[in-house]
């Protein structure tokens, strides 16, 4: 009986971890950057999603903020939506990115609007970019948006 390298790795736990993590390719991150709200970042992100869908890519939307814009909402048609996870805070319910649902669904590409968003207290991670990091680590490509004005809030992180 011949043992394969993978069989040996199953026996030795540290190597099993290595096999599982080395064979998973990290997802790519694409960011639509804009100077202010309303300049078309989300609209452009949704346009790219439709182009990818036309090429046969498995694309889902996890968080898309239309801000009441009809043209943007219309572009959501035909894109599978992952429902938000609701977090209760001070008697109110807030929708947040459902990372676990995205990981279970495991699409090729997921849309996550507003990368610099601060999650509701009680969420798994304090910031949405940390949620996105988990999705990327699972090998899923993320397309997101950022307002330049929100980058100033990252000064503390950059200094560290």
Residue ranges and their predicted role:
Residues 71-76, 153-159:
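Short acidic, glycine/serine/threonine-rich loops at helix termini
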Residues 127-148:
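Substrate-engagement module of ASCE P-loop NTPases
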